[in-house]
């Protein structure tokens, strides 16, 4: 697994991480199976795990899994997501409880009350509970506001959507991140599963075999990771074997411009 520097955070993270939206929002008997996904990811070299209080039980389930399989091997990225000051305090207190008193990467989710939440996260950083601060948004309509935050100098990295069917961030967000030295975490690199469900025929992957591509999901991940401005891509999965497969996409070699365009054409079919 290749490791990449996450912008000004000073941290190195695995090129492929693990997202937890929907897949770790479980209770009771389903929790053990999801713990195994986290264990498989760690075993495969994945170090970055992304969550949010917006994701239901995901933070708690992830925290329990990391306690079982190796919190010290993980870089936890979670978020604060509320316009209410008291709720923001509660969210951060809960997250610190879930993750053994420290959060490596703390993000303002979807820029909600961004300036006030940055104040809170900066205080936690001063207290030694947070290592690095970022901001996220999923919508192209919010990219101008996100870029204002990037220019403000208060974040070390951003999390934005990037996949073979959605390259909007390449127009302005990625160039600005590169200029400012900010890290980039790519959300929905598989299009929230939509692109994987539209997999091309195996014969169409033959031109990509020399890059270690075994599956369409790996081709999609290598498309994102072949952009050197991306620090980490965070696909989500509920299956240990898929976590292992996804992790292998984080190994060089990565695509050149010809292969990237080929994957884009396949994704548009």
Give the ranges of each region predicted by the language model:
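A short, structured active-site edge motif that brings together acidic residues
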Residues: 72-84, 104-110
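Active-site groove signature of glycoside hydrolases
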Residues: 96-116
